[in-house]
Each structure stands twice: as C-alpha cells, then as structure tokens.
Amino acid sequence: MHRGVGPAFRVVRKMAASGAEPQVLVQYLVLRKDLSQAPFSWPAGALVAQACHAATAALHTHRDHPHTAAYLQELGRMRKVVLEAPDETTLKELAETLQQKNIDHMLWLEQPENIATCIALRPYPKEEVGQYLKKFRLFK
C-alpha cells in the first residue's frame, strides 16, 4: 500500500536538500534483563516478543506524531536500540521519569500476570532522550 509522502518526511528531505543534517530518529527500548535469569528464566523468544509488543504499541499509539511518521517513511533505515534494565523496579522508575518529563513511551505489561516487561519510546532524535537512558547498557 502506497501512502504518499507525508509532511514529516518532506521536512526531513528538505533539511537534507538544504545541506542541514537530517535528524536521525531512533526508537529506544528498555527490556528487563532479570526475566532471562532465575527465578524467571524466560526464553529468548519470549523476551524478544515483549520488546516487539512494546515497540509496536508505541508506534501505533504515537502514529500521528511527525517523528513517528518520518521514521515509518524510511522502512529500510529504521533504527532501534535495545537497552537492559536490571529489574522491574528500575523499569518502573524509568517509566515514571519519562512520564514526568513528557517523553512519549509505552510501558508494556504482560497479561494476564500484569508484569512490566519493556518500555518503548516513540522514535526520537537521540539528543532529546539520551540523558534519560545513558545509565542503561545495551541488552546482551
């Protein structure tokens, strides 16, 4: 399905044409590392699914934001960074900080257990959100 070129993509393209660097948009995900370890011992596939659920929900929820629209226009250039939170408390503290700072995100809760598993931000220029994520390392 072809949707045409939207205004967000035109802004990014116009910046590139003018010689200005286009904004690099990144979707950050923060996934609980402890879920892969005892006593939880979730398999890798289950953790990947949680990150996918959170990312999809964040993109859908913020689909009308210009950054999300521009991010989705360049399917071959989408950038995601998956970081790890050591536990549920740390993940929920991050969600609270993001909420207080008006950073658009989705805290994914696995149902029916209601377990917080992952946070996905909508696509952002890394300069806008890096300060909130710098204490988290890449998920391994």
UniProtKB/Swiss-Prot annotation:
The keyword NADP does not apply. Changing residue 122 to Q: In NEDPBA; uncertain significance. GO terms for cellular component: mitochondrion. As a putative peptidyl-tRNA hydrolase, it might be involved in releasing tRNAs from the ribosome during protein synthesis. Some evidence, however, suggests that it lacks peptidyl-tRNA hydrolase activity. Pfam families: PTH2. It catalyses: an N-acyl-L-alpha-aminoacyl-tRNA + H2O = an N-acyl-L-amino acid + a tRNA + H(+). Keywords: Hydrolase, Intellectual disability, Parkinsonism. It is linked to Neurodevelopmental disorder with early-onset parkinsonism and behavioral abnormalities: An autosomal recessive disorder manifesting in late infancy or early childhood. It is characterized by developmental delay, intellectual disability, learning difficulties, behavioral abnormalities, and parkinsonism and spasticity usually developing in the third or fourth decades. It is an enzyme of class 3 (hydrolase). One of its GO terms (molecular function) is peptidyl-tRNA hydrolase activity. The gene is PTRHD1. This is Putative peptidyl-tRNA hydrolase PTRHD1. Belongs to the PTH2 family. PTRHD1 subfamily. Its EC number is 3.1.1.29. InterPro entries: Pep_tRNA_hydro_II_dom_sf, PTH2, PTRHD1.
